């Protein structure tokens, strides 16, 4: 009889760990959200309703897309996924190796990254689909010395219809996400894990509050036992589960803040483009074309025609300082973060003006973030085991909580590489 494994979370870390363990363990995945459904309404139709004032708070997006969760803070908005596939269903499908911080503490994931590049549909063969505006942006950035490079994508380009829905769920499944790793695995949805019982140096029992549907008022309490328990509820969910189970976490939160810089541009049609088609690597931030739907619908400065604006994203590697408690973020950018962000804004202004935009027409988006992590960071002492001494022997963490420093880069591939290694350690 196979041993039992419980995996809490179905995002990049949880789904990959479950997939890797399924041959040797009887795996059950517990997902707090429900089955993912992509946003299906035409964005052009929703755009016509903006001036009515109906869209007055970013949290309203949860009504249209239940898998997208919003934590609104004074300085920024936290966006994360809750549903089968985790945040991978809402990410733009970027496949970037971002393990510099792990290398510094002696963790080499070359083997795992090589496997991922062989196993997954990772490609840069999407340039032929770029719009004239995307091509122009790329050329201007090349001429200005920003060294833009096509973004590796988890993508099947021949299935992509350039609908611009990448961050709201791909309607054609052209974009790969971790739901594809879960075929044949028992996934229990609507299962919010409240705590894990720990005794005699072992994780013994998982306590769950299960809802049959998103709108259900009835909750069932469940208790499950397993030989191995993996917490992969994301950098936002994992700290709460660990603390409720008596395991402390560090106030070491990073979130990779995002700020978009935009301007009017006739017939730009950026809403019908692949999001983040290429990237410029800067010092502690990146720049990439990105239609910021959160700002478009809820930031009044963005009340421009949907096909008549161009937007550049700054994604920042922020200082690891902050906390999450009961699904609520405490996070402020430091003076150094603001300094780097302002340099990014300056770069974007120069690029847009290089494309013919007038400086006075440039406006900023809403500061938001979607890559929380770092609250149970690995150190050199755990380079071989990838297992914190704060955890019982049979309890592992397998998400961005383990990352020792902010990335300022898309984290999905790196989290999956970590998950592969952790699953191997468990199996051996």
Where on the chain are the PLM-derived regions?
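Conserved acidic residues
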Residues: 3-4, 227, 393
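Rossmann-like flavin
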Residues: 84-162
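Helical element adjacent to the flavin cofactor pocket in flavoenzyme catalytic cores
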Residues: 161-227
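A glycine-rich dinucleotide-binding beta-alpha-beta segment and adjacent secondary-structure elements
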Residues: 158-169, 189, 194-195, 344-406, ...
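Residue-level detector of alpha-helix initiation sites
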Residues: 11-12, 236, 402
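Glycine-rich loop(s) and the adjacent beta-strand/alpha-helix scaffold that form part
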Residues: 20, 27-29, 33-43, 196, ...
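FAD cofactor-binding and catalytic pocket of flavoenzymes
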Residues: 63-68, 72-73, 78, 85-87, ...
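N-terminal glycine-rich phosphate/pyrophosphate-binding loop and immediately adjacent elements
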Residues: 1-101, 249-256, 260
């Amino acid at each position: 009889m196979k041993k039992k494994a419980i995996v809490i979370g179905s995002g990049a870390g949880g789904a990959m760990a479950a997939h890797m363990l399924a041959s040797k363990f009887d795996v059950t995945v517990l997902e707090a959200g429900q089955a993912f459904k992509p946003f299906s309404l035409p964005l052009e139709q929703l755009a016509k309703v903006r001036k009515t004032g109906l869209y007055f708070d970013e949290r309203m997006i949860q009504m249209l897309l239940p898998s997208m969760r919003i934590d609104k803070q004074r300085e920024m908005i936290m966006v994360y996924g809750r549903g089968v596939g985790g945040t991978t269903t809402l990410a733009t499908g970027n496949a970037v190796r971002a393990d510099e911080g792990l290398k510094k503490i002696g963790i080499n994931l070359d083997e795992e990254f090589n496997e991922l590049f062989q196993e997954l549909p990772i490609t840069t063969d999407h340039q032929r689909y770029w719009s004239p505006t995307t091509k122009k942006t790329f050329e201007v950035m090349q001429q200005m010395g920003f060294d833009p490079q096509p973004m590796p994508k988890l993508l099947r380009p021949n299935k992509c219809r350039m609908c611009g829905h990448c961050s709201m769920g791909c309607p054609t499944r052209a974009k790969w996400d971790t739901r594809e790793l879960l075929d044949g695995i028992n996934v229990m949805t609507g299962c919010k894990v409240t705590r894990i019982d720990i005794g005699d140096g072992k994780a013994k029992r998982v306590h769950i509050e299960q809802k049959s549907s998103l709108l259900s008022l009835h909750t069932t309490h469940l208790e499950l036992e397993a030989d191995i328990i993996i917490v992969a509820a994301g950098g936002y969910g994992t700290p709460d589960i660990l603390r409720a189970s008596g395991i402390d976490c560090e106030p070491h939160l990073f979130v990779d803040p995002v700020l978009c810089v935009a301007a009017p541009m006739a017939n730009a049609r950026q809403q019908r483009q692949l999001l983040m088609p290429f990237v410029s690597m800067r010092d502690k931030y990146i720049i990439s074309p990105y239609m910021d739907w959160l700002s478009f619908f809820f930031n009044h400065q963005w009340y421009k025609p949907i096909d008549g604006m161009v937007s550049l994203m700054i994604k920042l590697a922020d200082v690891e300082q902050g906390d999450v408690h009961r699904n609520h973020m405490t996070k402020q950018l430091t003076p150094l973060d603001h300094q780097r962000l302002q340099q990014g804004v300056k770069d974007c202004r120069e690029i847009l003006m290089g494309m013919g935009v007038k400086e006075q027409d440039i406006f900023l988006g809403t500061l938001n973030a979607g890559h929380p992590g770092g609250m149970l960071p690995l150190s050199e002492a755990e380079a071989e085991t990838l297992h914190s001494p704060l955890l019982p022997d049979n309890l592992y963490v397998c998400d961005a909580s383990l990352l020792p420093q902010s990335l300022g880069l898309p984290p999905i591939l790196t989290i999956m590489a970590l998950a592969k290694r952790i699953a191997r350690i468990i199996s051996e």
